[in-house]
Amino acid sequence: MAKKSMIAKQQRKQKFKVQEYTRCERCGRPHSVIRKFKLCRICFRELAYKGQIPGVKKASW
């Protein structure tokens, strides 16, 4: 889990647009966030396996 102070810092309006970054809405992780779902890869995988994300299913070939 991310520190509450870091989450609060990220949510503030940044002075420059390039300083803004995405964070997982579920756990607060700043890296490997899938923008469409606003989730990190770990949370995305957990929710996809449980079937809680509509339209997403495990790939098999």
From Swiss-Prot:
Subunit structure: Part of the 30S ribosomal subunit. Contacts proteins S3 and S10.
Cofactor binding comment, as recorded: Binds 1 zinc ion per subunit.
GO cellular component terms, semicolon-separated: small ribosomal subunit
Name used for this protein in its record: Small ribosomal subunit protein uS14
Source species of the chain: Macrococcus caseolyticus (strain JCSC5402)
Family: Belongs to the universal ribosomal protein uS14 family. Zinc-binding uS14 subfamily.
Cofactor(s) required for function per UniProt: Zn(2+)
Gene Ontology MF term list: rRNA binding; structural constituent of ribosome; zinc ion binding
InterPro entries: Ribosomal_uS14, Ribosomal_uS14_bact, Ribosomal_uS14_CS, Ribosomal_uS14_sf
A GO BP annotation: translation
Functional description taken from the UniProt entry: Binds 16S rRNA, required for the assembly of 30S particles and may also be responsible for determining the conformation of the 16S rRNA at the A site.
Residues engaged in binding Zn(2+): 24, 27, 40, 43
Disulfide bonds: none
Keyword terms, alphabetized: Metal-binding, Ribonucleoprotein, Ribosomal protein, RNA-binding, rRNA-binding, Zinc
Listed NCBIfam families: PRK08061.1 (NF005974)
